[in-house]
Amino acid sequence: MIRKTEKLVITFYTTTEAMAMERLCRERMAPGRLIPVPRQISAGCGLAWCADPGCEEALTDLMRRGGITHQEIHRCLV
C-alpha cells in the first residue's frame, strides 16, 4: 500500500487556469504537478496543482506574478 503524505493542493475554477499553472511552473522549474482533485476536496474544474507544503509561499507568489487565479489552497494527505 502506498503511504500518503501531506501535500499542498491548489484548486482552480477552470481547466484553463490549471493548465496555465502547469505551463508557468514548467517554465520557471517550480515544483509540483497536476493531479485530479482529491475526493476530500470539492472544487471547480477537477484538476489541482500538488506540491510539497513548504512551497506554498513560492507558488502563491508565482501565481500572483503570473496572473493565475486559484480557487483554494489546501493541505491534505495525498
What are these regions (language model features)?
Residues T14-P31:
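Short amphipathic alpha-helix segments
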